């Protein structure tokens, strides 16, 4: 999430979060600078263990512009800003489920859970297919509390390996 003071700036109309708004990107630049300083020497290119970077989280599913083209462009903006700061890795990932934006050159990552504390009910959940051996998984129950989210994929699932960012037991 974002710090309260930044969310308040959006509520006052001073910036638009999770867009290419220059005022928002000013804070992204500061944030990426801090991360780059702390990650110095840990990137794969420097012999470190960091081989992947997730630029955004649930972007296009739970936040961000409703226009996919604008959302995809913003993801590329964030990646370029990260790379400019030295935050480079062999792999860049993006949330792949729920219509989240997965631009070209990003690996989609999915997730699955045994429980769904965000669900609007208390009845027993069906067993999750995410814990079975099969070629591809998409847990439709993840973030089912977000009605503004989009459904489906913004990438061709046949073109990518099955990777997870969230697999909770």
Please give the residue ranges for each predicted region:
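Alpha/beta-hydrolase active-site loop
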Residues: 30
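Substrate-binding/catalytic cleft of secreted carbohydrate-active enzymes
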Residues: 2-27, 35-169
């Amino acid at each position: 999430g974002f710090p309260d003071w930044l969310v308040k700036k959006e509520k006052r109309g001073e910036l638009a979060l999770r867009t290419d708004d220059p005022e928002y990107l000013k804070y992204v630049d500061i944030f990426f600078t801090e991360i780059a300083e702390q990650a110095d020497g840990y990137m794969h290119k420097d012999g470190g263990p960091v081989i992947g970077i997730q630029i955004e989280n649930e972007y296009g599913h739970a936040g961000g512009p409703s226009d996919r083209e604008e959302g995809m462009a913003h993801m590329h903006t964030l990646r370029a800003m990260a790379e400019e700061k030295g935050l480079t890795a062999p792999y860049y990932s993006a949330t792949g489920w729920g219509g989240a934006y997965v631009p070209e050159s990003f690996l989609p990552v999915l997730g699955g859970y045994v429980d769904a504390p965000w669900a609007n009910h208390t009845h027993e959940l069906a067993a999750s297919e995410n814990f079975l051996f099969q070629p591809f998984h998409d847990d439709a129950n993840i973030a089912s509390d977000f009605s503004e989210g989009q459904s489906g994929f913004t990438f061709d699932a046949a073109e990518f390996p099955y990777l997870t960012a969230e697999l909770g037991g």
